[in-house]
A protein has these predicted regions:
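Glycine-rich phosphate/diphosphate-binding loop of Rossmann-like nucleotide-binding domains
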Residues: 6-45, 155-245, 395, 416-418
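Structural signature of hydrophobic alpha-helical transmembrane segments
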Residues: 60, 422-435, 456
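Structural/interface elements that position substrates and couple domains in central-metabolism enzymes
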Residues: 2-107, 114-144, 148-164, 178, ...
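Small-residue-rich segments of transmembrane alpha-helices in multi-pass membrane proteins
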Residues: 460-470
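Phosphate-binding loop/pocket of nucleotide- and phosphate-handling active sites
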Residues: 347-418, 519
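ADP-ribose/adenylate-binding Rossmann-like module
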Residues: 83-116, 251-310
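Adenosine-phosphate binding glycine-rich loop
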Residues: 116-118, 122-160, 165, 286, ...
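A structured beta-alpha segment of the ubiquitous adenosine-cofactor-binding alpha/beta core
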Residues: 54-64, 74-75, 222-251, 256-269
Length: 519
């Protein structure tokens, strides 16, 4: 099976679907690879590097007529016509937003997989190009903001005076938002972030940011792993929060997107006007309509109030080498999934939830939209235990006279024992008493669930007792011999029981369950 990697023709696209490193991995799966000449130049991957990796350098027609075509941007109608019958195209397709492209693909007897339709489940994380590109975009958004911002991000105290740190507000704490939070925080800025999902507050704090919540936050995840649509009441309360925050910050980075829908409007025109001159807004959702009023895709707009609104839609492509490597790795992981035998033979299994969710067209048949894939929710917290209807009565404190009598009697007995006992016995009794105290506090604090493995650990202690008792079996005193025999018997029971418990514990981790003793 031949894999084709054509050059991207979309204006401004700098990424490539395979790098020399990922080409080696594809060859290791049993495929042949042809790369269009010049496909990786913008990503610092010349033709010679692909040739050294084992790929064949060919023309656009050779790449597009391969059995499996790997592409980054949505193909044009002319490129779709180049596909041979029965070919498989893997690319970003935006099927929910571009039904015309779906119809164009269905007019050909080809199969098309959308890399931007990977479900948000743990098994598909290695294929998720949206997360990979969002991570790069969040990082690059901060870099673009720093370039347009006229001051330091970090605060400084210099001989020329004190420089306050920049204040950054990140709207949306998804993959892109978290990347922006971490980058801005590492540059020394004071970072605030908000999201419709209150549970992300801990993630924001872990990256050095401060969570700014909307009063009476609502959880809106839509069951897909992405943020969902919010209510009108929530939007009004969020607008008040944004209006307060943007007046106080220097940089705003918006990342809010809803799959299959236009981007929600978060920052209104009057909010932009309230910001200080020199402030910067990066609208990462400009391609889907924008989160900010006045943002223009692929342009930097400066308002009359001196606020710069950056609407770049190619933020991942502004780091072409890194973006191509991550995109290519996601594609390699998909090809691994489609090649279960690793023999260079492509197998599309529509019973697999990941492959089914990505399949837009199969042999000219439209399979979009796929069945919904629900993300597993976190288990609910167990209900709190109800207090007992009749709490047990508190114990009466011991009588001081009784306590004094017990302590005094014990002291007298201890004095008599030490006065009339040999020094060797006193030393042994002291060690014995200390062992009782230490053992009580150590074993007494062990949780009940750990008592079984504790029996396994005590084999060594019981073994020492057995050895000591065996040394006393030949004593001249009959009493010592009897006590030694009893000690060997009791300690041996503990040893044998400990080994039995250990064997059953280890058997729990075996494929067949607990190990059974053979008859």
């Amino acid at each position: 099976v031949l894999i084709g990697v054509p050059r991207e023709t979309r204006p401004g696209e700098t990424r490539v679907a395979a790098t020399p490193a990922t080409v080696r991995q594809l060859l290791g799966l049993g495929y042949d690879v042809v790369v269009e000449s010049g496909a990786g130049v913008a990503a610092s991957s010349p033709d010679a590097a692909y040739a050294d990796a084992g790929a064949r350098i060919g023309t656009a027609a050779e790449a597009w007529t391969a059995d499996l075509v790997l592409h980054v941007a949505k193909p044009t109608p002319a490129e779709i016509e180049l596909l041979r019958d029965g070919a498989v195209l893997v690319s970003t397709l935006s099927p929910a937003l571009d039904p015309e492209l779906v119809r164009t693909l269905a007019a050909r007897p080809v199969t098309a997989l959308a890399m931007d339709a990977v479900p948000r489940i743990s098994r598909a994380q290695s294929l998720d190009v949206l997360s990979s590109m969002a991570n790069i975009a969040g990082y690059r958004a901060v870099i673009e903001a720093a370039h347009a911002f006229g001051r330091f991000f970090t605060g400084q105290v210099t001989a020329a005076g004190k420089v306050p740190p920049a204040k950054v507000l990140v709207a949306g704490a998804g993959v892109a938002g978290l990347a922006a939070i971490g980058t801005a925080s590492s540059l020394g800025a004071v970072v605030r972030a908000t999201d419709v999902r209150p549970e992300v507050a801990e993630q924001i704090a872990s990256l050095g940011g401060e969570y700014v919540g909307v009063p009476a936050d609502e959880q809106s995840a839509g069951g897909t792993g992405y943020a969902g649509v919010t209510s009108e009441d929530y939007d009004r309360r969020a607008a008040r929060m944004y209006a307060e925050q943007v007046r106080d910050v220097d940089i705003v980075i918006t990342t809010a997107l809803i799959p299959g829908r236009p981007a929600p409007r978060l920052i209104a025109e009057e909010m932009v006007a309230s910001m200080r001159p020199g402030s910067v807004i990066v609208d990462m959702a400009a391609a889907q309509g924008g989160n900010v009023a006045g943002s223009v895709p692929d342009q930097v707009v400066t308002t009359p109030g001196g606020v710069s609104i950056i609407g770049y839609t190619d933020l991942p492509g502004r780091l072409p080498g890194q973006a191509s490597q991550l995109f290519g790795t996601n594609l390699v992981n998909l090809v691994k999934l489609l090649t279960p035998a690793k023999d260079g033979q492509l197998v599309l299994d529509l019973d697999d939830v990941v492959q089914r969710a990505m399949t837009v067209v199969r042999d000219g048949e439209v399979l979009w939209p796929p069945p919904p894939v629900q993300v597993s929710a976190a288990p609910a917290a167990p209900p709190a235990l109800r207090p007992a209807a009749h709490p047990p009565a508190a114990r009466r404190p011991a009588s001081p006279v009784r306590t004094a009598a017990v302590v005094g009697t014990a002291a007298v007995l201890l004095f008599l024992a030490t006065a009339f006992s040999p020094n060797q016995l006193i030393g042994n009794l002291t060690v014995f008493a200390l062992a009782i105290v230490v053992g009580f506090y150590v074993i007494g604090n062990v949780h009940h669930a750990l008592h079984t493995p504790l029996m396994s650990v005590t084999n060594a202690i019981s073994g020492i007792i057995v050895v000591g008792a065996l040394l006393q079996l030949g004593h001249t005193s009959t009493l010592v011999t009897v006590l030694a025999f009893v000690a060997v018997l009791v300690a041996s029971i503990n040893v044998f029981g400990g080994f039995a418990v250990t064997r059953r514990m280890l058997g729990m981790f075996a494929a067949g369950g607990p190990t059974r003793t053979r008859p």
